[in-house]
Every structure is written in structure tokens, then in C-alpha cells.
Amino acid sequence: PNGSIAPNFTITDINGESHQLYELLDQGKPVLLDLFAVWCGPCWNFAELGVFDDFNEVYGNSVFVVAVEADPTTPESSLYGGSGSIGDWTDVIHYTLANDDFIGDSSLYNLNYYPTIYLICPDRTVSEIGQGPSSGYWSIQTLAEEVFNYTCDPMTGINVGMQSYNSELEYCGDGKIEPIVTISNTGFETITALTIQTLIDGDV
């Protein structure tokens, strides 16, 4: 959902280059993620428009643009056409292109339709900025408005936040609580020490 923390992933594009989401975000660049399927008509129509290609040409130094074939039932070879694929996707997508089963086979990105387009900020928060047929009406201007209307907070020296919490939400005073938390630092400085305090009814 919007405002949640984007799960990390590593993809290998069709040129054999590996890209890890968090490493890209740590460079201070937002990531524009287009999740599509090779059999999806609206996905093909949108790709043919060349909006993402044009956006990448103009804003590629500020935003990392990537298209991922996310249907776990289709092999990477389907990107080049053949049975079950609308056509050769390398003819219509000229920015970073990959096939990845993990993204589509998990519920992490809540894929309910193709295409689904996410903007992921350097602080790892994710926003859905487009889906389905609506993206077919975009131009580079409207896409830029969609992207830059979502203001990503600038990276600071240290920016620590809790990414997940796994424990009981209620405590009746008996026994002990052993919470499991995941924290992340989206700043550009390394954390050398960290203190975590647990409060119960406002008391440490």
C-alpha cells in the first residue's frame, strides 16, 4: 500500500547486469518500476507509446527507470516474442528490462493487474502512481507530473526508521515481551551505535 516500505529485490536485466533496489535507492535516486506481463495488451500498448523511453531519456539521471516482466509463469525468452507473448518487447522497451519471477510470485507488491507502476523513494517508501488502462493516456509531461508530484524526502546524514515490528501488541503485565524489529537507515552516514527503548504505557 502507499506509504509502506518497499521490499528489497535483486533483478538481472536482459544484458546480464544485476540491480538491487536498496543499492539504487542508496544513491539518492527514486526508482520508477513498471510491472507488466508479456501477454498483456494494455502493457504492450503503453510500451509502444514510448512514454517511459522518453521519460528515461530526459530524466534518467535523476530517476532509475526499470520494466520488469512479473508473471511468474513466463520465461525470460518470452520477452523476445514467441508463444504466449504479444511481441518482441525489446523492440518497444529501450530502458532497463528484466524478467523476474519473485516479484510477481509473491504478495509483496500486491499485483492485482498489469501494468502496475510504482514510484519508490530513497527512504524506501512506495507509491502506486499508475495502473491498467489509465497509464495508456500518459505523455512524458503527465508522467513527469505524476512522478514529481510525489515528493521524496531528501537523504540526510542519518535517517533511522522502523521497517517492521513482530510481537504482541498487548501486554497484561505477566511474562515478558521479546519484540523483533527491523530498522533501516536511509541516510548516507553509517550508524556506529544504536539504542532502542521499549515503552509500556509510556514508561521505559
PLM segments and residue spans:
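A short beta-strand-turn-helix
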Residues: 10-31, 57-58
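Surface-exposed loop/edge segments in extracytoplasmic proteins
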Residues: 17-20, 126-128, 203-204
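Conserved redox-active cysteine motifs that mediate thiol-disulfide chemistry
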Residues: 30, 35-50
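Short beta-strand segments
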Residues: 34, 66-69
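Short, internal strand/loop/helix patches
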Residues: 66, 80-120
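Thiol-/selenol-based redox modules, centered on thioredoxin-like
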Residues: 113, 119-161
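Extracellular/luminal regions of secreted and cell-surface proteins that mediate adhesion/ECM remodeling
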Residues: 149-204
